[in-house]
Structures are given as structure tokens and as C-alpha cells.
UniProtKB/Swiss-Prot annotation:
Protein name: RNA-free ribonuclease P
CDD domains: PIN_VapC-like
Species of the source: Methylacidiphilum infernorum (isolate V4)
Taxonomic superkingdom: Bacteria
Coiled coil: none
The enzyme's E.C. designation: 3.1.26.5
Gene3D superfamilies associated with the record: 5'-nuclease
Length: 202
């Protein structure tokens, strides 16, 4: 039986969640309806589950969700991570820090020695924040929740389901199978077999 580790982006990214419904209630009920019939096991780390409940509120969660989606943290102390992944991560962080410094220097020059830039100061600060955030966070693991999701998929030899490009990138480095979250509904349908047949639901 196939195993899937779910990232919060399935339910929080509107471009992804709309495959299951038009609002939060129909999204969760639509997912659970298919997942409960699929011949598969579903997992989500506790940290990611807490984050999801914080974002969406507790109203959409019930015993049904926790019955279908196993809430379980990775066994961090037992996992052996390839050293090459750690070296790649350090190199990536170093490059991003250098890039962030260049962005900061660029905006300092725009401000000028006397703050005489034609760009209003608050706009300049906002632009600096946005570019700095993009340089340091986009396409990288930037939270404990992201790391927990990847480590759990690695430990269980499961399929990682996410829309996050940074998670996809680092999961690929670790040899984790990846499913684009936008394809999850179709995948679940293929894993549902009608009673008495061996064929998936069309």
C-alpha cells in the first residue's frame, strides 16, 4: 500500500485546494471523502498539523481527519541523513546570505548619503524587505514544519505531496518521491477500486 506524507500547502494554497472544493469546508470534506476510499496511507507531522489548524482554525478538523491522516512526527534521533545534503544546504545558505547582503547594499546606495532618494523611505524599506525575503527564503527549507514533512517522507519511504518548490528541491536531493499537490485528487481517484473489481475508479 502506498504511503503519502501531506504538506499544508494542499489545504492552504488556493490554486491547489480548489481541486477538492470552493471553500474550506468543501475542501476538507472532499479530500476526506476520497482519501477514506483510497488504498493508501496518509501521514502529516504534528508540527505541520498544528500549523494547519492555526491557519484554518479548528472548526474544519474532527476525529475523521485524524483517523484518515495519521498524525506522526519523524523519528529524528534515528534518521541518517546523507552528508552531501547537509553540505549542499550549507552552500545554499551561504550563497543566499551573500545575495541578501548585496541587496541590502543596493538599497543603502539608493537611499543616498543624505537620504535624498526620490523613492519614499517607507517604500524603499518595503522593497528591501520583499527582495531580501525572496532571496533568503524562496526555494529553501525555512521552517521546522517543512523539515518535519521531508524527514517523515524520508523515514517512511513515502511520497511527498506538496506545492512548495523549496520542499520539492530538497526532497529530490534526498531521493524522496514527489507528487505535485495539484495532481492529488486525480491520484486519489486512481487509488480507489470499486468493490469486486481490480480497476480504479474513472
Amino acid at each position: 500500500m502506498r504511503k503519502f506524507v501531506l504538506d499544508t500547502s494542499i489545504f492552504t494554497n488556493p490554486d491547489v485546494s480548489q481541486q477538492f472544493g470552493d471553500d474550506d469546508s468543501s475542501v476538507f470534506s472532499g479530500f476526506l471523502s476520497l482519501a477514506s476510499k483510497a488504498e493508501a496511507l496518509f501521514y502529516m507531522p504534528l508540527s505541520a498539523y498544528k500549523e494547519l489548524k492555526l491557519i484554518k482554525g479548528t472548526a474544519f478538523f474532527s476525529s475523521d481527519f485524524e483517523f484518515i491522516v495519521h498524525i506522526r512526527s519523524p523519528r529524528k534521533f534515528n534518521l541518517l541523513i546523507p552528508g552531501s545534503v547537509l553540505y549542499d544546504f550549507i552552500d545554499e545558505i551561504r550563497k543566499r546570505i551573500d545575495h541578501g547582503l548585496r541587496i541590502a547594499e543596493e538599497h543603502l546606495k539608493l537611499a543616498g548619503p543624505d537620504g535624498g532618494t526620490p523613492i519614499p523611505f517607507d517604500q524603499l524599506v518595503n522593497r528591501l524587505r520583499n527582495r531580501y525575503r525572496e532571496a533568503l527564503r524562496q526555494g529553501i527549507l525555512d521552517s521546522r514544519e517543512d523539515v518535519d514533512v521531508i524527514l517523515l517522507a524520508y523515514e517512511l519511504e513515502a511520497v511527498l505531496v506538496t506545492a512548495d518548490e523549496g520542499m520539492k528541491k530538497w526532497a529530490d536531493k534526498m531521493g524522496i518521491e514527489i507528487l505535485n499537490a495539484s495532481y492529488l485528487k486525480d491520484c486519489l481517484k486512481n487509488l480507489i477500486k470499486p468493490e469486486g473489481t481490480g480497476e480504479p475508479v474513472s
